[in-house]
Regions:
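Short, solvent-exposed interaction modules
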Residues: 69-95
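Intrinsic, low-complexity N-terminal interaction/targeting segments
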Residues: 30, 36, 54-67, 100-116
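C-terminal "cap" of GNAT-fold acetyltransferases
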Residues: 36-52
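Short, structured motif recognition centered on aromatic/hydrophobic residues
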Residues: 5, 12, 22, 46, ...
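N-terminal beta-strand motif that seeds the catalytic metal site of vicinal oxygen chelate
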Residues: 1-17, 74-83, 133-136
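Vicinal oxygen chelate
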Residues: 44-45, 81, 90-136
């Protein structure tokens, strides 16, 4: 079951250059910054009411975010939906013929379990399913 829009992921070239707009101009509280080595990104989470904004900076030219920025420029990368039982939800979607980028959840920022749906199954939108750590 989808519980909420967990966050909106935005690809950026530099957190140092981008963060002041969000924290000083928009006055969004910075919740934290962490590196997700497996994805070759550094992420910053900001609180925006009931949801969050995730800024993603590539740490390597080989990262998916670096390739995204090179092809499309900076901007909205994905919408993350908070779910219960991510693996069960992935199995249901696969059975219904929905294309998945990952058939098995992996560990993402903050220890959350995450997996992406293929944009070709969702009108061109990249959706991430996200199960927060401790909410299994």
């Amino acid at each position: 079951m989808i519980k909420k829009v967990d966050h909106i992921g935005i690809a950026v070239k530099s957190l140092d250059q981008t963060l002041p707009f969000y924290t000083e101009e928009l006055k969004l509280p910075l919740l934290g910054i962490e590196e997700v080595e497996s994805e070759k990104v550094k992420v910053a989470f900001l609180e925006a009411g009931e949801t969050h904004i995730e800024l993603l900076e590539p740490t390597s030219p080989e990262s998916a975010i670096a390739k995204y920025i090179e092809k499309r420029g900076e901007g909205i990368h994905h919408i993350a939906l908070g779910v219960d039982s991510i693996q069960g939800r992935l199995n249901e979607l696969k059975e219904k013929g929905i294309r998945l980028i990952q058939e098995e959840a992996k560990i993402g920022a903050g220890g959350s379990k995450v997996a992406f749906l293929h944009p070709k199954s969702a009108s061109g939108v990249l959706y991430e399913l996200c199960e927060k750590k401790g909410e299994e």
